[in-house]
């Protein structure tokens, strides 16, 4: 899992939660350049914030990760309304703040979705149009 988040404490908390759940976090990217470097490791899943150290680059990062690397991308942001119709190739958005249980249910859904297993999206996840087609 790749975490694209510029708030260091939030990113560390996410990494700890995911590690405790048995997920391998390949890195934390606070900006587009770092995300592009870490993308070379082909993450299966990425959690991406919208507004990063280098500005509102999250949507572009998410689209690149999905389209160029085949990553399942979920936006995790306090500004979910900015993603009205979503970002092509990405799955959806969860509003911050989010608790450990919600992260767990969302990650479970993402893993199942990625491997083609049937799963219902958790209530905290707003799917983008055409996500499940």
Q: In which residue ranges do the predicted regions lie?
A:
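A Lys-centered signature of the CheY-like receiver
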Residues: 96
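His-Asp phosphorelay/catalytic-motif detector in bacterial-type signaling
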Residues: 67-74
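Conserved phosphotransfer microenvironments
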Residues: 48-66
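Conserved acidic carboxylate
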Residues: 5, 77
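CheY-like receiver
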Residues: 105, 113-133
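Acidic, metal-coordinating helix/loop segments flanking the phosphotransfer/catalytic sites
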Residues: 15, 28-45
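Two-component/phosphorelay signaling modules centered on CheY-like receiver
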Residues: 7-27
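Conserved two-component signaling phosphotransfer/partner-docking surface
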Residues: 99-104
